[in-house]
Amino acid sequence: MSHSVKIYDTCIGCTQCVRACPTDVLEMIPWDGCKAKQIASAPRTEDCVGCKRCESACPTDFLSVRVYLGPETTRSMALSY
């Protein structure tokens, strides 16, 4: 699958998205931009299955982590209706 995972600077460093990801796409890295001194990172986006559990787990209401599904997934979702 070809999905894009974006982490935004609204991340509060809580690790909820990292713990929610079933395929270990996300990890925490050092960052001085928030109190937690860490931010989520997505070094393994090729393993993303598009489940969006990271988005659901994020306490900032999807403002910090977003999964953009690839065209093949979006197309198959439309066909299932």
Swiss-Prot record:
Membrane topology: Peripheral membrane protein
Superkingdom to which the source organism belongs: Eukaryota
Residue intervals of the 4Fe-4S ferredoxin-type domain: 2-31, 39-68
Subcellular location: Plastid, Chloroplast thylakoid membrane
SUPFAM superfamilies (UniProt xref): 4Fe-4S ferredoxins
Binding site for [4Fe-4S] cluster 1: C11, C14, C17, C58
Binding-site positions, [4Fe-4S] cluster 2: C21, C48, C51, C54
UniProt keyword Amino-acid biosynthesis present: no
Keyword Metal-binding set for record: yes
Textual note on the cofactor: Binds 2 [4Fe-4S] clusters. Cluster 2 is most probably the spectroscopically characterized electron acceptor FA and cluster 1 is most probably FB.
Cellular component terms (Gene Ontology): chloroplast thylakoid membrane; photosystem I
Names of required cofactors: [4Fe-4S] cluster
Catalytic activity: reduced [plastocyanin] + hnu + oxidized [2Fe-2S]-[ferredoxin] = oxidized [plastocyanin] + reduced [2Fe-2S]-[ferredoxin]
Keywords, alphabetical: 4Fe-4S, Chloroplast, Electron transport, Iron, Iron-sulfur, Membrane, Metal-binding, Oxidoreductase, Photosynthesis, Photosystem I, Plastid, Repeat, Thylakoid, Transport
GO molecular function, one term: oxidoreductase activity
A Pfam family it matches: Fer4_7
Gene3D superfamilies: 3.30.70.20
A biological process from GO: photosynthetic electron transport in photosystem I
PANTHER family: PHOTOSYSTEM I IRON-SULFUR CENTER, PHOTOSYSTEM I IRON-SULFUR CENTER-RELATED
NCBIfam families, sorted: PS_I_psaC
Protein name, per record: Photosystem I iron-sulfur center
Species: Hordeum vulgare (Barley)
